[in-house]
Amino acid sequence: MRTEWVSARKGQANVSQMHYARKGVVTEEMAYVAKIENLPESLVMEEVARGRMIIPANVNHTNLEPMAIGIASKCKVNANIGASPNASDAAEEVNKLKLAVKYGADTVMDLSTGGVNLDEVRTSIIGASSVPIGTVPVYQALESVHGSIEKLDEDDFLHIIEKHCQQGVDYQTIHAGLLIEHLPKVKGRLTGIVSRGGGILAQWMLYHHRQNPLFTRFDDICEIFKRYDCTFSLGDSLRPGCQHDASDAAQLAELKTLGDLTRRAWKHDVQVMVEGPGHVPLDQIEFNVKKQMEECNEAPFYVLGPLVTDIAPGYDHITSAIGAAMAGWHGTAMLCYVTPKEHLGLPNAEDVREGLIAYKIAAHAADIARHRPGARDRDDELSRARYAFDWNKQFELSLDPERAKEYHDETLPADIYKQAEFCSMCGPKHCPMQTKITDADLDGLEQVLKSQGAAELVGVKQDKL
């Protein structure tokens, strides 16, 4: 799709969407995004130039269909996949990618940590993906020295970062906000550092007694990113791993640094989004979103959940989707899904499906709550189909049509029941939607009440209830 678009840009010193937007150029990617988001091209260009919207689109990922992440666009959902040393292989990860895209993932992150040829897995995923692909390069940096922190040097990090750019990775989680002076702030936490990338860098700093190399070499990383239009996803190494640790001094100290790094990247015209928690009580979610907007000049916020309770292993796609919906309502731009296997094991294909649907629900609920134009159209169309007992239309409009049809057909599988004016819940005689009260019926009732001297009925609009 993008081969012709990017051919003229390759070799230029800066090919980022932000760079072109700041020059007043509407790229083909911006025009494409404007169309699918139903936004003016000028607004997309202005938001990208401002840093409030990103279009993750590496020039080497030519089969990508561009999409936008930002408060002006629809709330997006990311799905994580990836092989571990103990489970999965390259073919299975590509299948997970296809399943994730099928069920609505807007971006996919390859979090492979070992057990396979990481470059082979990554290039296979990128080659098969029409959605942006993100990675966490510190995983491969550590794997490249066989897990020996003491052998890992600054150039190893930058070498892997550029390799990912060359392969077509659209955004990379860069844990540059974790500083050596932040580490003592972890004292008193119940769960310490729960970011894998953050943990690697914390170990590196503790061993070498030196500052985080991703921080000290941040400008060098910016120089790499702008040559490929790779986007920063600034990692939150000190995100809370439980309710107890939410919004603590460690988390907020790193967030302040992430704001500084956001502005540094923008000086290079490099796109940025900022990652966020994690595990956060419901009453602290709004504070966390607003604080990120304040510290990071409204760069798109990308949160993992957050989980609103810690007592439901096996159901954390639910505990986190609750928090994700609220975070999206308050302005979070992208939600990173959580599967039922979170904290328990590597998710399989069915776990990916369950997590994604939970998060598509959360993102859609957030869009409705934020009154995005057209956000509720599909809901209204499904409701009309439900009222008309148009079962096939209901399935078609569902986030997961296969599951909706499967559940309906468990008890009423025959085709004749696709025209039935009931389901197995109420049966043929007790469905309340069979009670068709028309406007004409109500007009007639009003006339009767008026003739009897009763007060005129006053209609109440649904949105004012």
UniProtKB/Swiss-Prot annotation:
Pfam families found in the cross-reference section: ThiC_Rad_SAM
Name of protein: Phosphomethylpyrimidine synthase
Keywords, alphabetical: 4Fe-4S, Iron, Iron-sulfur, Lyase, Metal-binding, S-adenosyl-L-methionine, Thiamine biosynthesis, Zinc
EC number in record: 4.1.99.17
UniProt binding sites for substrate: N80, M109, Y139, H175, S195, R196, G197, D236, S237, L238, R239, E275, Y302
Transmembrane feature ranges: none
Listed InterPro entries: ThiC, ThiC/Bza_core_dom, ThiC/BzaA/B
A biological process from GO: thiamine diphosphate biosynthetic process
List of residues binding Zn(2+): H279, H343
Entry binding sites for [4Fe-4S] cluster: C423, C426, C431
Pathway: Cofactor biosynthesis; thiamine diphosphate biosynthesis
Top-rank taxon: Bacteria
Cofactors named for this entry: [4Fe-4S] cluster
Record's keyword annotation contains Hydrolase: no
Gene name per UniProt: thiC
Family: Belongs to the ThiC family.
Reactions listed under catalytic activity: 5-amino-1-(5-phospho-beta-D-ribosyl)imidazole + S-adenosyl-L-methionine = 4-amino-2-methyl-5-(phosphooxymethyl)pyrimidine + CO + 5'-deoxyadenosine + formate + L-methionine + 3 H(+)
GO cellular component, one term: cytosol
Function: Catalyzes the synthesis of the hydroxymethylpyrimidine phosphate (HMP-P) moiety of thiamine from aminoimidazole ribotide (AIR) in a radical S-adenosyl-L-methionine (SAM)-dependent reaction.
A GO MF label: 4 iron, 4 sulfur cluster binding
Gene3D superfamilies named among the record's database cross-references: 6.10.250.620, Radical SAM ThiC family, central domain
Claim: Electron transport is one of the keywords in the record: no
Cofactor annotation comment: Binds 1 [4Fe-4S] cluster per subunit. The cluster is coordinated with 3 cysteines and an exchangeable S-adenosyl-L-methionine.
